[in-house]
A protein has these predicted regions:
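Histidine/acidic-residue-rich catalytic or RNA/ligand-binding cores of hydrolases
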Residues: 46-47, 86-94, 136-140
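Active-site neighborhood of glycoside hydrolase catalytic domains
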Residues: 1-54, 58-72
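Structural recognition of the beta-strand scaffold that forms the well-ordered cores
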Residues: 33-36, 54-57, 75-78, 124-128, ...
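Short flexible/disordered coil segments
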Residues: 35, 39-60, 92-116, 186-204
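C-terminal functional modules
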Residues: 117-205
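Aromatic-lined glycan-binding groove of carbohydrate-active enzymes
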Residues: 63-129
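Tryptophan-centered motif/residue detector
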Residues: 36, 56-58, 84, 130-135, ...
Length: 205
């Protein structure tokens, strides 16, 4: 729930009511609700439940992380300026800057706000892929190529935070030796040894 206009107060209040309603609706199935941060942008009077609610903190102008923590929300750090992939769009990232993320970023960095490491209300981080431009030639394989190095890098950062002891250059070389999983080869790797990958036979009648 985000990116609604806040120009009209009645719309803001309905948006907040909508958000609160569906938080409770999801919880009615025994699940934890997760919302996209918008309650700074949609500031109003209608209360929105915060206890045991996860909020994806993606843009501080929409949800000020300090204020959201004060209100009681648990945050997932997904700042758009670092962790948004929009394939072949010309804005955000086509591929994440994994070196910068590995060396400098942790979930405690939400936009320009930096919180203490292992803050009890910051539950982790994630990246996002948004396929804004359908039909631009990007296939599911292309998305895989963009996602896999991001996944490897963020897996390390979720585990170690700021305490990455292995130099990035060593990590980056080592990650290339890891397979996607037993028997999985979505990337279509063929190895370093030259070999035929396609043979065409001509049959004579």
């Amino acid at each position: 729930t985000d990116e609604y206009s806040n120009k009209k107060k009645d719309v803001v209040e309905k948006f907040r009511e909508f958000t609160d309603h569906y938080i409770r609706f999801v919880e009615g199935f025994g699940k934890q609700a997760c919302v996209w941060g918008a309650l700074t942008h949609a500031k109003g009077d209608t209360p929105v439940k915060s206890e045991n609610v996860l909020m994806s903190a993606w843009y501080n102008g929409y949800a000020d992380p300090k204020e959201m923590i004060k209100q009681g929300y648990d945050l997932v750090s997904v700042p758009d300026g670092y962790l948004y992939i929009v394939p072949a769009a010309g804005y955000y990232y086509d591929y994440l800057n994994t070196e910068m993320l590995y060396k400098k970023w942790t979930p405690a960095h939400i936009g320009k706000e930096v919180f203490p490491e292992k803050h009890k209300q910051i539950k982790g981080g994630m990246f996002a892929v948004w396929n804004d431009h359908a039909g631009n030639g990007i296939s599911t394989k292309d998305i895989h190529y963009r996602v896999f190095p991001a996944l490897q890098t963020l897996a390390v950062k979720m585990w170690t935070g700021k305490d990455c002891k292995v130099p990035y250059e060593t990590f980056n070389a080592a990650r290339l030796s890891l397979s996607e999983g037993p028997g999985v080869n979505v990337a279509g790797r063929i190895g370093k040894t030259p070999r035929a990958v396609y043979n065409q036979e001509t049959l004579k009648p």
